[in-house]
A protein has these predicted regions:
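Active-site loop/lid in soluble adenylation, ligation, and acyl-transfer enzymes
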Residues: 1-145, 258-288
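Coil-to-beta-strand transition motifs
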Residues: 18, 93-95, 196-199, 211-214
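Intrinsically disordered, low-complexity acidic/polar segments
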Residues: 30, 109-110, 211, 225-227
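Surface-exposed helix-capping loop/turn segments at secondary-structure junctions
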Residues: 58-63, 187-199, 212, 283-288
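Conserved metal-phosphate-binding beta-hairpin within the catalytic cores
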Residues: 100, 199-220
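Anionic ligand-binding catalytic core segments
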Residues: 114-115, 123-172, 216, 220-282
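A long amphipathic alpha-helix within ATP-dependent nucleotide-binding catalytic cores
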Residues: 166-200
Length: 288
């Protein structure tokens, strides 16, 4: 079988009335696919998404049908697809990346230092890097093609983007995306904190099912789509150690111009070790 779509990390196969989404062991940073293959990474992404989808189906329906290859066509019943594949409902994806920030870090911190705002949202004075925000903030962005960068937009602009594609529905969809995003973040951040992990920020993607209902799609709260920090030793005032690909990003930044988009073996190994540690802390299980 050949995928109908290949993303930076995922391959999507058409399965008639459903899709099979395979998370590969590729890693991308700064919208570039690195040369490394990070063993087990795809399985962590798929199994972590499954865990969160199960935990949050009371808030919003999601696209997962099954993460068991026994439920999938014979082609997927081989070791290369076991654990990293998910059968999903077909959705019409909405053209917005739904980003939620509970802590000030990364590009949000850089923006706040300049003008006291993050994506146009005014924040209290006197915040330090990595501070918890009084309330999580919703900062949507556009979806970029591979090689391009997503662009931050205001809530009002997200209404316009959705209205253009779904006339008469822009405001309704934008409000639902915002409300679902905040509700999902709050529930999962509370859960994660009890397990020793701070979810600093994350992104969700949503689509419409055949009846026009909003459904959570793509991946959910993985180390690829989120910033995970250890709660132990958390201290505002500087950057935090992380359980996500920030470790790989930091190495690339520090070695700019000298890496040709490839991580040294020890950095690649440390990256997957962090992914596995996050998975085990959050789910209470070792990855099979």
């Amino acid at each position: 079988m050949k995928p109908i779509k290949e993303g930076k990390v995922r391959e999507i196969y058409d399965n008639g009335d459903s899709l099979i989404m395979v998370a590969t062991d590729r890693i991308s940073c700064f919208d570039v696919i690195l040369k490394n293959i990070i063993s087990k990474k795809g399985t962590v992404l798929t199994q972590m998404s499954k865990f969160w989808f199960d935990l949050t189906e009371d808030i919003v329906p999601n696209h997962m049908i099954s993460a068991d290859v026994k439920d999938m066509p014979e082609f997927f019943q081989q070791p290369a697809y076991d654990g990293n594949s998910m059968m999903c409902r077909k959705l019409t994806m909405l053209p917005i990346e739904c980003i939620v920030r509970g802590y000030i870090t990364g590009s949000g911190w850089a923006s706040y230092q300049k003008n006291g705002t993050v994506c146009g949202i005014k924040l209290p004075e006197g915040l330090q890097e990595s501070d918890k925000l009084p309330e999580p903030i919703y900062t949507p962005s556009t979806k970029a093609e591979i090689g391009d960068h997503d662009e931050n937009i205001s809530f009002e602009q997200s209404v316009d983007v959705l209205e253009k594609e779904f006339p008469g529905k822009g405001k309704e969809y934008a409000e639902k995306l915002r409300d679902y995003t905040i509700a999902l973040y709050k529930k999962c951040a509370d859960y994660a904190l009890k397990k020793g992990i701070i979810i600093a920020d994350t992104k969700f993607e949503f689509g419409l099912d055949e009846n026009g209902n909003i459904v959570l799609g793509d991946e959910m709260l993985t180390p690829d789509s989120s910033r995970f920090w250890p709660a132990k030793g958390y201290e505002p005032g500087h950057g935090q150690p992380s359980f996500d690909k920030q470790f790989a990003r930091d190495w690339l930044k520090e070695n700019e111009g000298n890496h040709d988009w490839e991580l040294p073996e020890d950095v690649a190994k440390k990256t997957i070790d962090k992914y596995l540690e996050a998975y085990e802390l959050l789910t209470g299980e070792k990855l099979k």
